[in-house]
């Protein structure tokens, strides 16, 4: 922001000038002290608090270290990691739909290992960001994260990714997620609901989510998803389980073309299908959507694609 911006004139220079003038009127010999105080205030405001807009800290060109603030185990192999930003008012500055890269030097690996993750927090939550990570036996970064203690640091770079969600970019979004593939979907769902007309926004996008997992306990972030669906009639969830409990009313087995046809928007120029999950599942969903008449997914998705794979 320019030092001569309207925001700084009204929020920094004007109060400082009033302090000096007011002091001159009351007691002239105090003016030098008032000038010094005003100068200090101006310098502080311009360097730290001169803008009401939060500072974006992500750098797409270089890794930065962020301190682990909290670890919250939500199952035997799934943890939410909260990393602190440099200042309480800072935000990541991550566009909706994009992700960040985590890097670490891991013993036995010839070079630094880098993996992508989507935060489950959003930029309206300042001072930190949250990552939901499932530790896989062969997952170098996910296993590395489990070794971190509060106070340790993690190297982060971003934003990256071809998806940048903007309000009303399409009429209806269909989502198919498996396991931790729910994280980019949640980011978009929360942004849409936060920007509904009832909340002062203008986003009227309809959203239908098919969320596939093996067991009931594998359904990540279920409470948050259920809360969002309960408060917003434009968002609907259909769960699919490989091993359903007795009395289960959702889908059973793998996500099928029939499930997609019944639950997600039909092919049209103003809809999108978003896919995220284990590679075998995403591959199967690409074939299924193509068989139903959706535009064939590209090997590397672009923003304009009808079927987009994270």
From Swiss-Prot:
E.C. code: 1.6.2.2
Residues that hold FAD according to the record: 146-160, 172-209
Compartments in which it is found: Mitochondrion outer membrane
Domain of life: Eukaryota
An MF annotation (GO) of this entry: transferase activity
Keywords associated with the record: FAD, Flavoprotein, Membrane, Mitochondrion, Mitochondrion outer membrane, NAD, Oxidoreductase, Transferase, Transmembrane, Transmembrane helix
Catalysed reaction, written as an equation: 2 Fe(III)-[cytochrome b5] + NADH = 2 Fe(II)-[cytochrome b5] + NAD(+) + H(+); 2 Fe(3+)-[Dph3] + NADH = 2 Fe(2+)-[Dph3] + NAD(+) + H(+)
Recorded coiled-coil stretches: none
InterPro entries: CBR-like (IPR001834), Cbr1-like_FAD-bd_dom (IPR008333), FAD-bd_FR_type (IPR017927), Flavoprot_Pyr_Nucl_cyt_Rdtase (IPR001709), FNR_nucleotide-bd (IPR039261), OxRdtase_FAD/NAD-bd (IPR001433), Riboflavin_synthase-like_b-brl (IPR017938)
Any one of the GO BP annotations: tRNA wobble base 5-methoxycarbonylmethyl-2-thiouridinylation
Domain called FAD-binding FR-type: residue spans: 61-166
Chain ranges passing through the membrane: 30-50
Cellular component terms per the entry's GO annotation: mitochondrial outer membrane
Top enzyme class: oxidoreductase
Cofactor(s) essential for the protein: FAD
Pfam family, any one: FAD_binding_6
Statement: the UniProt record of this protein carries the keyword Iron-sulfur: no
Matches recorded under SUPFAM superfamilies: Ferredoxin reductase-like, C-terminal NADP-linked domain, Riboflavin synthase domain-like
Location (main, coarse): mitochondrion
Pathways involved: Protein modification; peptidyl-diphthamide biosynthesis
Cited function: NADH-dependent reductase for dph3 and cytochrome b5. Required for the first step of diphthamide biosynthesis, a post-translational modification of histidine which occurs in elongation factor 2. Dph1 and dph2 transfer a 3-amino-3-carboxypropyl (ACP) group from S-adenosyl-L-methionine (SAM) to a histidine residue, the reaction is assisted by a reduction system comprising dph3 and a NADH-dependent reductase, predominantly cbr1. By reducing dph3, also involved in the formation of the tRNA wobble base modification mcm5s 2U (5-methoxycarbonylmethyl-2-thiouridine), mediated by the elongator complex.
Family: Belongs to the flavoprotein pyridine nucleotide cytochrome reductase family.
Database matches in PANTHER family: NADH-CYTOCHROME B5 REDUCTASE, NADH-CYTOCHROME B5 REDUCTASE-LIKE
Subunit structure: Monomer. Component of the 2-(3-amino-3-carboxypropyl)histidine synthase complex composed of dph1, dph2, dph3 and a NADH-dependent reductase, predominantly cbr1.
UniProt protein name: NADH-cytochrome b5 reductase 1
UniProt source species: Emericella nidulans (strain FGSC A4 / ATCC 38163 / CBS 112.46 / NRRL 194 / M139) (Aspergillus nidulans)
